[in-house]
Amino acid sequence: MEKKTTKKATASKTTTTKKAAAEKTEIKETKKTTTTKTSTAKKATTASVEKTEVKETKKSSDNKKEFNPQDRPFAKYNRGYPNKQGRRKKFCKLCAKGQEHVDYKDVELLYKYLTPNLKIASRKITFACSKHQTRVSNAIKRARIVALIPFVRD
């Protein structure tokens, strides 16, 4: 009977030692993760400090070259457009004037909205809003009927 009790005692001792060993490994693993977290945090802070130092040195250096447009390969294409977006958006000239009604008798205005072949120019060319483009085109058609503007170039 003594052998049975010793086996049970050794079995219970081994289970307790296994549990203790498992707890120790868990503690070690948590320590490792916390140390790696702290070490990465330290590395990150040192890296951010280095970056700020580099930025400060870049700002403090006043050894800039003078701007020469010939140094750029496509400098001739950028002339006249100093901003990066390019051209400014066109707007309707009739809206800017505040002119609501387009008179068919105003031939000078109507010729501005015609092509050299006396066709009605598109909105892409005239930069007119849709409201004024339709009013101008109707006025041109009326002026053609009344013979103020010819239908075809002679």
Curated annotation (Swiss-Prot):
Q: Where is the composition biased (Low complexity)?
A: 8-19, 33-49
GO BP terms, alphabetized: translation
Keywords assigned by UniProt, alphabetized: Ribonucleoprotein, Ribosomal protein, RNA-binding, rRNA-binding
According to the UniProt entry, which residue ranges have a biased composition of type Basic and acidic residues?
20-32, 50-69
- Entry's Gene Ontology molecular function annotations: small ribosomal subunit rRNA binding; structural constituent of ribosome
A GO CC term attached to the entry: cytosolic small ribosomal subunit
Alphabetized Pfam families for the sequence? Ribosomal_S18
The record's annotation in InterPro entries points to: Ribosomal_bS18, Ribosomal_bS18_sf
Has UniProt tagged this entry with the keyword Nucleotide-binding?
no
- Where does the record place the region Disordered? 1-82
Q: What does this protein do?
A: Binds as a heterodimer with protein bS6 to the central domain of the 16S rRNA, where it helps stabilize the platform of the 30S subunit.
What the entry lists under NCBIfam families is as follows: S18
Q: Cross-referenced HAMAP family, in alphabetical order?
A: Ribosomal_bS18
**Which family, according to UniProt?**
Belongs to the bacterial ribosomal protein bS18 family.
Q: How does it assemble?
A: Part of the 30S ribosomal subunit. Forms a tight heterodimer with protein bS6.
Annotated protein name in UniProt: Small ribosomal subunit protein bS18
